[in-house]
C-alpha cells in the first residue's frame, strides 16, 4: 500500500495545481459542496487523513476557499483572485480564470526554458 503524502504542498506540484483547480471547478459546477469537493480531490492526491481533517476543520471554523488554497501552497495572486470572487459571488468563474492563468504561466515557463535568449537578438 502506498504511503499517503504528509506534506500537502508536495502533493500539489505546479502541474497538479492546474488540474486541482480544474477538477474543483467541475465538481462545484456539478453541484458538489465545497467541502466534499476538496475532500474528494485531496483523497485523490493521497493527502494524509490528518491534513484532510485539518482542512475540514478550517472550513467548519469559517475559513474560505481562498484560505484553503493559501494553505495548499497557491500563490498570493491566486488567493487574492479567489478572495475577490468570494466577495462578489463568482467563484466558479474565477476558478476557470485561475486555471487559464496557470496554464499560460506554465507555457511561458516552458518557452523561457526552451528559448531563454529569444529576445537577445532583437536588441543588438
PLM region descriptions:
Residues 1-118:
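Catalytic metal-binding core of the metallo-beta-lactamase
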Residues 118-124:
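Alpha-helical transmembrane segments of integral membrane proteins
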Amino acid at each position: 500500500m502506498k504511503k499517503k503524502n504528509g506534506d500537502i504542498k508536495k502533493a500539489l506540484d505546479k502541474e497538479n495545481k492546474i488540474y486541482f483547480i480544474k477538477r474543483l471547478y467541475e465538481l462545484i459546477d456539478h453541484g458538489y459542496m465545497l467541502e466534499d469537493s476538496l475532500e474528494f480531490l485531496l483523497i485523490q492526491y493521497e493527502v494524509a487523513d490528518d491534513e484532510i481533517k485539518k482542512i475540514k476543520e478550517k472550513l467548519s471554523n469559517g475559513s474560505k476557499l481562498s484560505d484553503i488554497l493559501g494553505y495548499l501552497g497557491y500563490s498570493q495572486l491566486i488567493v487574492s483572485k479567489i478572495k475577490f470572487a468570494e466577495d462578489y459571488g463568482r467563484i466558479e468563474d474565477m476558478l476557470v480564470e485561475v486555471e487559464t492563468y496557470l496554464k499560460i504561466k506554465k507555457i511561458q515557463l516552458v518557452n523561457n526554458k526552451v528559448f531563454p535568449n529569444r529576445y537577445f537578438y532583437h536588441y543588438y
